[in-house]
Regions:
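Conserved nucleotide-binding/hydrolysis micro-motifs of P-loop NTPases
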Residues: 240-242, 274-277, 381-383, 420-424, ...
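Interdomain helical connector at the RecA1-RecA2 junction of SF1/SF2 helicase-like NTPases
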Residues: 483-545
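Amphipathic alpha-helical interface elements
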Residues: 1-135
Length: 545
């Protein structure tokens, strides 16, 4: 029975071994910055880690994490090929560690023939005892990792020398292996069925009349079908060493063939197994995404083709926003959205109604057919609670959920959350079938309260994961907004989508009353603040300003 399920447990063990290896690396390499959370996903996504690890190896360990999560959360069977891929990729990472930090490095090649194929008798009770001992060892290892910190300097020096004198060449993957190892797994993680009576994915799907040449055949790498039997999307796969955009022309030709056959043009993905691009040339622009989309999300996007309206003709509800500058902000965002821009920054002085403007924008985009699900992010639970209460007053007809205190309503139209809560929810929140609830295209609009550089630095993974329209809100004067915040929202000239500053609110709009300074003495003004005296939490808070 144990060997019958060996393929299912190998990914879990590989993931556990990878986690220990990654934590070891953090303990000895002082160039790595510890992320906010020390879970495996956060550790391998941290910017300095990505820059340190060999690019191909980093892509391979992402597969180990994904397959491990799939095995743990869904209970679905894992094939021998998938289990071997996970083991092979773990081997590549450990080999890279040896190459950089090992004392007696030897260039090795993964050899699956060394894995025993014959069944042998096992002592089940002995295995159970060993598993218990392993758990105890894990705790001991955690303690030993901390002792390694004093050796960081010597390890860093060894790494620099070893990389100059040693050779390391990770294996490239063929187009076929790319499909089997990485794209198939992404499809499974998004709930697609590749085989069986409920299969909704066709592989090497034949199309005719390529490039409008009668009888000329082509074979689509993947076609994703909806519940109505109509194609929702095509996937064009290329080797991992190739830019996924290389398959763009081929994907368009396949989509056009399917349009002639079915009367509707499917959306398109191009991918090399790691980097993926998506576009709907009927109603959207091409852009990178974290993975393929779920069936439900693709159907939503397909339906939206006929639902979208001209946003300039959608009346703004005066019951929500009746001030001219709030309406100007909404119109500015809507105009940019219709031009294909996906990131927007609103700079509005405190007290001028940022949350009210955000709810009115949500209302306009919803009635215009652009938005179904909304995510509102704030950095404190009190702000999340207040924002939900405000939205409830402004949009009483929409279902709302404060994810920080209520997991039951996570399918609500508008979800409110802190950044850490959402970071966990991305991988942990699942439906009865074990499929992810918060898929990459689940949210159509993401509102970021009090946008500042520390948020994008610490929680960048959230914004890279979700594919929705981003709207950042900040009260920081536009000239004081950090340059990298403008870069994040892709504004080259440090000019936001719309700005309504304090001076205008006081002197022109008379929305705010002026403030007056009263001079007082504090320890801060007299003695100053010294960074070394601050707690880590206070250092982070100070960094925001």
């Amino acid at each position: 029975m144990i060997f019958k399920k060996i393929n299912d447990v190998v990914p879990k063990w590989c993931r556990k071994a990878l986690e220990l290896a990654v934590k070891w690396l953090y303990s000895v390499d002082k160039s790595l910055e510890q992320p906010y959370k020390d879970n495996l996903q956060s550790l391998i996504s941290e910017k300095t880690f990505v820059q340190t690890v060999d690019p191909t190896v980093w892509l391979q360990i992402r597969y180990v994490v994904k397959l491990g999560n799939h095995a743990v959360h869904t209970g679905n069977q894992v094939s021998r090929e998938e289990a071997l891929s996970s083991l092979r990729n773990l081997f590549a990472f450990v080999q890279w560690l040896d190459y950089c930090y090992g004392a007696d490095y030897e260039e090795r090649t993964f050899d699956p023939s060394m894995i025993p194929t014959e069944k042998t008798s096992v002592d089940v009770e002995k295995i159970r005892k060993q598993e218990s001992l392993l758990q105890e060892k894990d705790a001991q290892i955690e303690g030993l990792l901390k002792q390694l910190e004093e050796l960081q300097g010597s390890f860093a020096q060894k790494k620099e020398t070893n990389q100059k004198t040693r050779h390391f060449a990770p294996n490239d993957l063929s187009e076929y292996a790319t499909r089997k190892q990485y794209i198939d797994l992404d499809l499974k993680l998004m709930g697609w069925k590749l085989e069986g009576p409920d299969a909704d994915v066709a592989v090497e799907y034949e199309v005719t009349d390529m490039e409008n040449k009668p009888g000329q055949k082509g074979y689509v790498d993947y076609v994703l079908f909806g519940k109505d039997g109509m194609p929702l999307a095509v996937i064009e796969a290329k080797r991992t060493s190739k830019d996924p955009k290389i398959g763009r022309k081929q994907a368009i030709l396949y989509a056009e063939c399917l349009e002639r056959k079915y009367g509707r043009k499917p959306m398109m993905f191009t991918t090399n197994g790691f980097d993926t691009n998506f576009w709907d040339d009927v109603s959207g622009t091409e852009h990178p995404v974290v993975s393929v989309f779920s069936k439900g999300d693709l159907q939503k996007l397909m339906d939206r083709r006929t639902m979208r309206k001209d946003l300039t003709k959608i009346q703004i509800d005066d019951k929500i926003t009746d001030r001219y500058y709030q309406k100007e902000a909404i119109r500015a965002v809507c105009e940019k959205i219709m031009m294909g821009k996906r990131k927007h920054l609103l700079v509005m002085a405190t007290g001028t109604g940022k949350t009210r403007t955000a709810s009115s924008l949500t209302d306009v985009l919803s009635r215009g057919g652009y938005v179904t699900n909304v995510l509102f992010l704030a950095d404190r639970t009190a702000l999340v609670k207040q924002a939900k209460e405000d939205f409830q007053n402004y949009l009483p007809g929409m279902s709302l959920c404060n994810l920080c205190i209520n997991k039951e309503d996570k399918n609500a139209r508008i979800v409110f959350s802190t950044y850490p809560t959402m970071l966990n929810a991305i991988t942990e929140e699942r439906n009865a079938e074990g499929d992810l609830i918060f898929t990459p295209a689940h949210f159509d609009l993401i509102i970021i309260d009090e946008s500042h550089r520390s948020i994008f630095k610490k929680y960048r993974a959230i914004f890279e994961y979700f594919d929705g329209i981003l709207v950042g809100l900040t009260a920081t004067p536009k000239d004081d907004v950090a340059h990298n915040t403008y870069n994040f929202f892709e504004y080259k000239n440090d000019i936001p989508t719309y700005a309504y500053d304090y001076h205008t609110a006081v002197e022109v709009g008379h929305v705010l009353v002026p403030f007056y300074n009263y001079e007082v003495k504090t320890d801060f003004t007299v003695k100053g603040i010294h960074n070394d005296d601050l707690s880590e939490k206070d250092k982070e808070r100070y960094e925001r300003f």
